[in-house]
């Protein structure tokens, strides 16, 4: 149902993927996730569900942010563990404070907003399961529509289409990988 998933559905040429709507696989309900996995028998889960925009929703509705990005992610991890299925979690470069750019996976995390905190919370549950890959990527649509969104932030936005092309090269990896485009401020 999300922006990235629709690009992935239309542009992906390399991976055999199935897509499930929120109604077909409700990440807020562990039984729903388990049922979806039993029915579809995936070899891996690309977890890109969650709450992202508008950014201020993470301040206005903290409960929704926690439910979708932390608890929902934990439910997906629990289900993956139950069936020994790899999870690839799309996190965000917003887990970093955004002051220097070009962050390494070894740099300390310090989110600058509640969205970053919610993605970091999701990362915590994914990190507990070793059959996993966390991709810290900050994606956006072409053309970039929010040029003045953050004037005091250094980021490495990557376009959805570029990430779709890169994804097949990453699916066998594990751990945490930062992915980004050209540094912008």
Which residues does each predicted region cover?
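Conserved Rossmann-fold NAD(P)-dependent oxidoreductase catalytic core, especially the SDR/UDP-sugar
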Residues: 74-110
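Active-site Tyr-X1-5-Lys
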Residues: 110-138
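SDR active-site strand-loop-helix element
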Residues: 20, 45-49, 87-93, 134-137
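Adenosine-cofactor binding site in Rossmann-like domains, unifying the SAM/SAH pocket
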Residues: 13-36
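NAD(P)H-binding glycine-rich loop region in Rossmannoid oxidoreductase-like domains
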Residues: 30-68
């Amino acid at each position: 149902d999300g922006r990235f998933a629709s690009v992935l559905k239309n542009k992906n040429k390399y991976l055999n993927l199935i897509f499930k709507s929120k109604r077909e696989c409700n990440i807020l309900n562990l039984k729903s996730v388990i049922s979806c996995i039993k029915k579809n028998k995936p070899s891996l889960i690309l977890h890109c569900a969650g709450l992202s925009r508008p950014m201020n929703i993470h301040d206005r509705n903290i409960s929704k942010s926690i439910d979708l990005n932390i608890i929902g992610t934990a439910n997906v991890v629990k289900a993956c563990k139950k069936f020994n299925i790899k999870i690839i979690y799309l996190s965000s470069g917003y887990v970093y404070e955004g002051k220097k750019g070009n962050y390494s996976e070894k740099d300390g995390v310090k989110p600058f907003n509640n969205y970053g905190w919610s993605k970091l919370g999701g990362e915590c549950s994914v990190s507990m399961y070793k059959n996993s890959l966390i991709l810290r990527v900050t994606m956006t649509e072409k053309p970039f529509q929010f040029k003045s969104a953050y004037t005091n932030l250094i980021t490495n936005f990557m376009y959805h289409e570029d990430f779709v092309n890169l994804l097949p090269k990453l699916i066998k990896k594990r751990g945490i990988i930062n992915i980004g485009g050209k540094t912008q401020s």
